[in-house]
Regions:
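Structured cytosolic domains appended to multi-pass membrane proteins
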Residues: 1-150
Length: 151
């Protein structure tokens, strides 16, 4: 958002920038992207949809269905007004944080992980690590599943 900050009596324009991570294996990424788009709209912010391709999730290692879903999500992000970015890295969290710093991102939006606990323990929990390591960024974890009516 364009806001005015007073620093020593001077006024300066600050543009809010938001980043959302796009995974190749998340079935609810489309919903996450729509939420990020709404948040960016409310803040009048620029936003980025960033996919980090790791060696284990390279194009040749993920299934056709996951790859098509990833491309669909990248297209959805672009249609919603995001600048889409595809990076390669061994370390998803470090790549996201480095990108955020390079682009002046102040808020990172991620979806709550739905991986089984054993998989998070074995492979590491990207969301938890992002919260722990991105101490200078606001990290917002959003629910991406529809809540059932509890009547």
């Amino acid at each position: 958002r364009e806001s005015i900050k007073r620093e020593g009596g001077h006024r300066s324009n600050v543009i809010e920038r938001i980043m959302v991570g796009v995974s190749s294996n998340a079935s609810d990424t489309g919903q996450l992207l729509r939420k990020a788009s709404r948040i960016a709209g409310q803040l009048n912010a620029e936003w980025f949809a960033v996919h980090i391709e790791t060696p284990s999730e390279s194009v040749k290692n993920i299934g056709t269905r996951d790859f098509v879903a990833l491309l669909d999500n990248i297209n959805v992000a672009s249609d919603l007004g995001a600048e889409t970015v595809w990076l390669k890295s061994d370390d998803v969290v470090k790549a996201l944080i480095d990108f955020a710093h390079d682009k002046g991102v102040s808020k990172v939006i991620v979806g709550r992980t739905h991986q089984p606990r054993w998989r998070r323990w074995l492979k590491g929990d990207v969301v938890a690590r992002l919260v722990a390591d991105a101490t200078d960024l606001d990290v917002e974890i959003v629910a991406t599943e529809e809540r059932e009516d509890s009547r």
